[in-house]
Amino acid sequence: MMKKDIKIAILMTCHNRKEKTLQCVSTLCDALARYHVSASDGNIDAKLFLTDDGCTDGTAEAVGRECHTRNLQRTIVKGDGNLYWAGGMRLAWMMALKDEQSWNYYLLLNDDTLLQPDAFSMLFNAQRYCLDTYGCEGIVSGITSAIGDSSTMTYGGEVFVNKFTCRRRLLTPIGKPQLCDWAHANILFVPHQVVETQGILYKGYVHGQADLDYSYKARQRGIPVVVTAQICGTCNFDHPDVAAISKLLCAMTFSERRNYLKHPLHSDADYLLMTRRCMPQKYPLTWLFRKIHLYLPHFYYWLHKKR
């Protein structure tokens, strides 16, 4: 019997990180090739949908050449440089939905993430786990470790330790998939039926939090959200720690701090939106603390230590 190809739309967005983006696409192609060699249930028919969000360093052109060399279909769409992560990923996802092909899965992939050679086997194994355990496919987040340090986990999925304060614990691999409360989209594998149920990333997000919202809303709908059984890729944690950001903000004037916190990369707006949509009971207190963060940063970080 002839095996059916599994159709996967790969979704990425990029902005002036040519070398990182090329490394990501190279490991993607390696993982696809590895799966084609070892697959027992059909090959992958993949196509890359990349948002070029105002790149000036030739990222999109270099990716196009790499895809041509590696025989990977691609559609590259231009942004204006102001889409940021959430906007760029939404645009790539919308392009995939408009494509003439009908996709079985969508793989959201950060351009600073390097896939393990057997990444697709891990993702499909996690889907089989969802089917066996929950009776349906779900959202799978690939666990990532720091580059060159497999003992330090960086992204994947988290479970709440205290839902009211939003304290969370990052899951580490245990040899089988684990259910999580919310998931990161460094490597996020979404079946088409989930998209039919809840659509794509919510349009209100500019940069961050959209992946957390998406996975949390899926859990509310009864859709399983799990992490892979093993490390699925590598990606360095690129967010400043509390000590560094508190030192930076406390040294700023009020005007500097306000402008900093208005920038999409640091804005409170995405976090407040996520809180209002996912944890509305926590929103008033979160809004208050965000104001304290702006007006009284020393007091805010003193309170943070007391949590």
Residue ranges and their predicted role:
Residues G135-T154:
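Short beta-strand-to-loop element that shapes/binds the nucleotide-sugar donor at the catalytic cleft/hinge
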Residues S246-R307:
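Non-catalytic, C-terminal membrane-associated alpha-helical segments of glycosyltransferases
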Residues R169-V190, R257-N259:
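A recurrent flexible, glycine/aromatic-enriched loop bordering the glycosyltransferase active site
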Residues S102-L114:
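Short beta-strand-to-loop acidic/aromatic patch adjacent to the donor-nucleotide binding site
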Residues I8-C24, A31, T51:
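A conserved hydrophobic helix/loop-capping motif in glycosyltransferases and polysaccharide synthases
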Residues G79-D99:
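Glycine-rich, basic loop-to-helix element that forms the pyrophosphate-binding segment
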Residues S26-I44:
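Short, acidic, metal-binding catalytic loop of nucleotide-sugar glycosyltransferases
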Residues T51-E61:
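A conserved acidic beta->alpha catalytic loop
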